[in-house]
Amino acid sequence: MGLGVKSTTEGNATFLAVAGGYVWDKSKDETHPQYNTQEYKKIDDSVGVRAGARYDNLTGEIVGVRFNQHEKYGESVLVTVASGGEKFIISIGTNNRYSQDMLKALLKMNFSKPIFINPYDFTDKVKNKRVQGISFKQDGEKINLRNDDAPFKEASFWKEANKKQIKRFFEDLTEWFTTTVTEKVIDVYFADGDVEATEKVAPKVVAKVEEIADEMPEVSENDLDDQLGALLG
């Protein structure tokens, strides 16, 4: 693959981020064949640029899950994926849409089988809304991310609630998912850290060729208010 990067804290692993509908290895520079840049609009309407090796998706076996608390950046979920003899650590802040889909998937997937991880971020032309998240497949079938036990609000809540109430709901929802993933996934499968992959999978980190036509505002991974503002307009 040529994606491995030596980490002083995680051994031989590649740290990956999910942003703008892609998987990014931000440690790579212009010399890497998959190097690319992507502009995004910040919350203050200024334009930022993310850069690094850019990929469409990642296929592999989940061999580790843990939560990490950072003094500056807050809580994140770290998901270790084994693929073709290499390890990739996907790091996502727990208060963004990508992490919600990741946490939902962790409660539904089979950890003994490889999984296809495909982020997306585009504009629904009909509804004129941003559509953002991650889709997952196992055995060629899309994983249904619906978790019936998760906190739920009726349609009337979304019509009448103010931003503070919605913010509180998402905070409660995030807490439910992090607690449930800890109890049902980490404590059960990864209590002692990363495990060995049970199946060798040919690495599939695919570069997306086409550019995103519409650049959407970037959602801060560190501020739920930013997330809600982007979702609610």
Give residue ranges: language-model regions:
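Acidic, gly/ser/pro-rich intrinsically disordered tails
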Residues: 1-15, 164-233
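OB-fold ssDNA-binding interfaces and closely related basic DNA-contact patches used
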Residues: 1-91, 101-107, 122-171, 175, ...
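Short, glycine/acidic-rich beta->alpha junctions
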Residues: 98
